[in-house]
């Protein structure tokens, strides 16, 4: 990023136990492998470390939380403020009865496998959701006929001031690919409800999910997952295909030939290439169908060409 005009907030930060980096590259933390730098990137060692930073961070400083970057596009101009990446101690998974408590940094697939081992059905869909539990909560992630609102009993989060909040279904306010939790709040964990099942049956369902993903989606390339949310009563990919966008190229970005609701970095794309391609897809779909597609991929930061 370009140098900030006001660096006072950085001078206020406490000594941390985790890792604090400034002007830190973000591309390595996204599946697209594109984007600019974070003004500050913080990987806290534990909850106390995270709270200590939030308590002194001025409220005007943006806070952005990222996981493994599977459904994320970081713009080329970088991300102002504080980017927080949760891993390690925030990725624990515990089983008690028919409930799994998973840290926000836990991989969705790992949670699904833990449920399988514990003989808890109902969480198999998470094996088809690339990313972490924190991201799944934020966007009410779903796949293969289920979504987070179906299994989430409660969640823990920190508000912008570092206060612990316990969120039930009403506070979470799940809707299609959204939650009502304020931006800037940081999910810490989720309690997920399963139901008794046979590990063999659960494993077979997960294997079927993996097979379908492998056959229908570009899972071994630089992509950000499903690009656009499905409009009510429609499949985004069908609208995109009908608009003639399958295989469409812009710079180093391409609409996947295999599944046209996926955008690809073919090797040398910029974030602008990917975003501009997505906007061109939206324009063509609106022109041909009258339907306005909405981004499902989370776009953060500023464009390099922004005035």
UniProtKB/Swiss-Prot annotation:
Annotated family: Belongs to the MurB family.
Subcellular location field: Cytoplasm
EC number(s) on file: 1.3.1.98
Signal sequence span per UniProt?
Answer: none
Q: Which GO terms describe its molecular function?
A: FAD binding; UDP-N-acetylmuramate dehydrogenase activity
Q: Where is the active site?
A: 177, 226, 296
Q: What does this protein do?
A: Cell wall formation.
Pathway membership: Cell wall biogenesis; peptidoglycan biosynthesis
A biological process (GO) of this protein is: regulation of cell shape
The cofactor(s) it depends on are: FAD
Q: What is its main location?
A: cytoplasm
Catalytic activity, reaction form:
UDP-N-acetyl-alpha-D-muramate + NADP(+) = UDP-N-acetyl-3-O-(1-carboxyvinyl)-alpha-D-glucosamine + NADPH + H(+)
Q: Which protein is depicted?
A: UDP-N-acetylenolpyruvoylglucosamine reductase
Keywords carried by this UniProt record? Cell cycle, Cell division, Cell shape, Cell wall biogenesis/degradation, Cytoplasm, FAD, Flavoprotein, NADP, Oxidoreductase, Peptidoglycan synthesis
Which Gene Ontology cellular component annotation is one that this UniProt entry carries?
A: cytosol
Q: Which residues form a coiled coil?
A: none
Query: Pfam families attached here?
Result: FAD_binding_4, MurB_C
- Ranges for domain FAD-binding PCMH-type come to 34-197
Quote the InterPro entries the UniProt record gives: FAD-bd_PCMH (IPR016166), FAD-bd_PCMH-like_sf (IPR036318), FAD-bd_PCMH_sub1 (IPR016167), FAD-bd_PCMH_sub2 (IPR016169), MurB (IPR003170), MurB_C (IPR011601), MurB_C_sf (IPR036635), Oxid_FAD_bind_N (IPR006094)
């Amino acid at each position: 990023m370009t140098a900030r005009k006001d660096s006072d907030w950085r001078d206020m930060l406490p000594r941390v136990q985790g890792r604090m980096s400034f002007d830190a590259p973000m591309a390595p933390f996204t599946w697209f492998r594109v984007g600019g730098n974070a003004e500050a990137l913080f990987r806290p060692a534990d909850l106390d470390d995270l709270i200590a930073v939030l308590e002194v961070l001025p409220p005007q400083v943006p806070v952005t939380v990222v996981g493994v970057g599977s459904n994320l596009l970081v713009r080329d101009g970088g991300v102002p403020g504080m980017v927080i990446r949760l891993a390690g101690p925030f990725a624990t998974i515990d089983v008690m009865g028919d409930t799994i408590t998973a840290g926000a940094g836990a991989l969705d697939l790992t949670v699904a496998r833990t449920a399988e081992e514990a003989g808890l059905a109902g969480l198999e869909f998470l094996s088809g959701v690339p990313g972490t539990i924190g991201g799944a909560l934020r966007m009410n992630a779903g796949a293969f006929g289920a979504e987070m609102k179906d299994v989430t009993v409660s969640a823990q989060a920190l508000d912008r001031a570092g206060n612990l909040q316990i969120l039930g279904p009403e506070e979470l306010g799940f809707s299609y690919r959204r939650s009502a939790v304020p931006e800037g709040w940081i999910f810490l964990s989720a309690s997920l409800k399963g139901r008794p099942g046979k590990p063999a049956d659960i494993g077979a369902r997960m294997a079927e999910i993996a097979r379908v993903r492998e056959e229908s989606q570009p899972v071994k390339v630089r992509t950000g997952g499903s690009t656009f949310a499905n409009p009510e009563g429609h499949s985004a990919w069908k609208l995109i295909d009908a608009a003639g966008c399958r295989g469409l190229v812009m710079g180093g970005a391409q609409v996947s030939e295999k599944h046209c609701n996926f955008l690809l970095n073919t090797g040398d794309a910029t974030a602008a290439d990917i975003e501009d391609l997505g906007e061109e897809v939206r324009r063509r779909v609106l022109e041909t169908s009258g339907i306005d597609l909405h981004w499902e991929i989370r776009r953060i930061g500023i464009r390099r060409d922004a005035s």
